[in-house]
Regions:
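Active-site beta-loop-alpha junctions enriched in small/polar residues
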Residues: 7-11, 37-40, 76-80, 137-139
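Catalytic domains of carbohydrate-active enzymes, especially glycoside hydrolases
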Residues: 14-42, 123-131
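Aromatic-lined substrate-binding rim segments of carbohydrate-active enzymes
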Residues: 38-90
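Active-site-adjacent "subsite" loops/lids of carbohydrate-active enzymes
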Residues: 72-127, 136, 140-165
């Protein structure tokens, strides 16, 4: 069995965080420590969030690798959550099926969004973490208000499957 501990990727108190992780590891609290990276796009054009987060992770990784403490990344809020307020207009947003309201979540069918998240994932992979865990952002049906995405991209895909216009 593996036990993971999720660590906020903070830039302050790095030494204290590293010592706390080392104590948790030595005490058997967890055997791998995952640093949380929130990648919900922000800004227009979208900011390179992964680049800055990877630079911060790199410092923790070097210190933990030197102590042979397994560490990795939790990719959090990659398509966004309704409560994140940001101004990205470059991507198709989730459109609620039930009421047609646009949310602050990105549609995973959007090629531009896929390119953004692919670059972010490549940056994270380039750091060679022991493990990468993906948050459950892709629960596009039951757990989201509106029950499903009815954006133009999803409607086009659905119509193609149904051979309809």
């Amino acid at each position: 069995m593996n036990i993971y501990s999720i660590i906020p990727l903070l830039s302050e108190n790095e030494n204290e965080i590293i010592e706390d992780i080392a104590a948790q590891h030595a005490g058997g609290v967890a055997d791998c420590f995952l640093f949380s990276m929130t990648l919900a796009p922000k800004g227009t054009p979208p900011l390179d969030l992964a680049g800055g987060l990877c630079a911060r992770y790199r410092r923790f990784k070097a210190a933990l690798d030197a102590r042979r403490i397994p560490n990795g990344v939790l990719i959090q809020a990659s398509i966004g959550h309704e409560y994140y307020q940001n101004s990205t207009r470059d991507f198709q947003h989730f459109v609620n099926l039930t009421d047609g309201q646009t949310t602050n979540t990105r549609c995973p069918l959007d090629e531009a969004f896929l390119s953004y998240i692919e670059r972010a994932a490549a940056a994270i992979a380039g750091e060679h973490p022991s493990l990468v865990m993906l948050d459950d952002d892709f629960r596009l049906m039951a757990a989201r208000r509106g029950k499903a995405c009815a954006c133009p991209l999803h409607m086009k895909a659905l119509n193609a499957l149904l051979d309809a216009d």
